[in-house]
C-alpha cells in the first residue's frame, strides 16, 4: 500500500493523473470538498470511489446538487466525518499513547522568532517529522 507518485495541483492535476493512469485511479481522497468534487470524479476509473473528508476549499455545500446527475455512472461517492470526541474517547487515546510509549518524530525545533524559517522548511517538505515552534516568551 502507499503512493507510487506525488503530484502537485498546478491546474493540470486531472490531466497529469490521467497521463499516469489513462483509465483513471481507483480511489480519490478529496480534502477540498465540494469545491473540487465534480472535477475529482474525472480522475476516477470505472467503479472508482471518491471519498470526501474535508472542506479545505472553503465551500461547504454544492448548490443544486443532484446525485443522479452529479455522480457519474459507475462511480461511487462516500465520505468520512470525524466529529468531536468525548472525554472518555480522548482518555482512551492518551492511555494507549502512554502505554505504548508513542512519540512523534521531531525533525526540527524553532523559536517563535524563527517562525518564517520553520514555515519555509514545512513548505519545502524536505524534513521527515514534525516541525515544532516554541514560544519562549512569558
Predicted regions and their residues:
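C-terminal hydrophobic helical "lid"/dimerization subdomain
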Residues: 86-138
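Short, surface-exposed connector motifs at secondary-structure boundaries
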Residues: 19-25, 45-48, 99-102
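Short, surface-exposed acidic/glycine-rich loop or hinge patches that mediate macromolecular interfaces
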Residues: 11, 34, 83-84, 109
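Glycine-rich phosphate-binding loop and adjacent beta-alpha segment
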Residues: 35-99, 135-138
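Short catalytic-loop micro-motif centered on adjacent basic/acidic residues
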Residues: 26-29, 51-52, 78-80, 104-107
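Adenosine-nucleotide cofactor-binding segment
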Residues: 1-39
